[in-house]
Amino acid sequence: MLLVIGLGNPGKEYQYTRHNVGFIAIEKIVNQYNSSFSTKKKFNCEIAETISDGQKIIFIKPTTYMNLSGKSVISVKTYYNIYPAKIFVIHDDIDLETGRIKFKTGGGNGGHNGLKSIDGVIGNNYNRIRIGVGRPQNNQGVADYVLNHFSKPEYETVMQAIDRITSNFGLILENKLEEFKNKIA
């Protein structure tokens, strides 16, 4: 069983912001598996489930704000008894140029409040799919930057990155994580 978490903030005003790139990516992956999200208040998230190659996959989008994402993650992790090695978090990363993707297991949170929240409840030995959104320019604050919408060229670049994640997601199911890492880079 896998647990895949897309990080973002709830609400239409945040829908296509840089900070919601995790939501955008997970929605595309869920569509690929012909599944859809439904709200589960007891888990503080939207959840979608599917079975592929005999393996159950649980996808979640926390309905808390980013800095409380751990609340959703711990409730789903505990309910389904999922080990951190089977958890994959998709999130924005300002330390990567727009559209660049990196995959890693464990490590620090890089100041990302969603990851800080998750680390606080399950530790940091889970998998991360980091999608670059670039750094703020012209003295713009980080919070303002990540809560703003992509420009059209940025959005197109990010969607190409998300397409690489989606088209190679099956490698995660096959536990070919190194191959996944290389194909999405």
Curated annotation (Swiss-Prot):
Fill in the subunit field for this protein.
Answer: Monomer.
Q: Which family does it belong to?
A: Belongs to the PTH family.
- Which residues are tRNA-binding? 14, 65, 67, 113
- Alphabetic keyword roster: Cytoplasm, Hydrolase, RNA-binding, tRNA-binding
Which transformation does this protein catalyse, written as a reaction?
an N-acyl-L-alpha-aminoacyl-tRNA + H2O = an N-acyl-L-amino acid + a tRNA + H(+)
| Chief location bin | cytoplasm
Q: Gene encoding it?
A: pth
Query: For site (Stabilizes the basic form of H active site to accept a proton), what residue positions does UniProt give?
Result: 92
Swiss-Prot/TrEMBL site (Discriminates between blocked and unblocked aminoacyl-tRNA) positions = 9
- PROSITE patterns named in the record: PEPT_TRNA_HYDROL_1 (PS01195), PEPT_TRNA_HYDROL_2 (PS01196)
Q: What is its EC number?
A: 3.1.1.29
Active site: which residues? 19
The terms describing its cellular component in GO are: cytoplasm
Intracellular or extracellular location(s): Cytoplasm
Q: Name one GO molecular function term.
A: tRNA binding
Query: What is the stated purpose of this protein?
Result: Hydrolyzes ribosome-free peptidyl-tRNAs (with 1 or more amino acids incorporated), which drop off the ribosome during protein synthesis, or as a result of ribosome stalling.
Q: What name does UniProt use for this protein?
A: Peptidyl-tRNA hydrolase
- Species: Rickettsia conorii (strain ATCC VR-613 / Malish 7)
Q: In the UniProt record, does the keyword Hydrolase occur?
A: yes
Give one GO biological process term. protein quality control for misfolded or incompletely synthesized proteins
Q: Which InterPro entries match?
A: Pept_tRNA_hydro, Pept_tRNA_hydro_CS, Pept_tRNA_hydro_sf
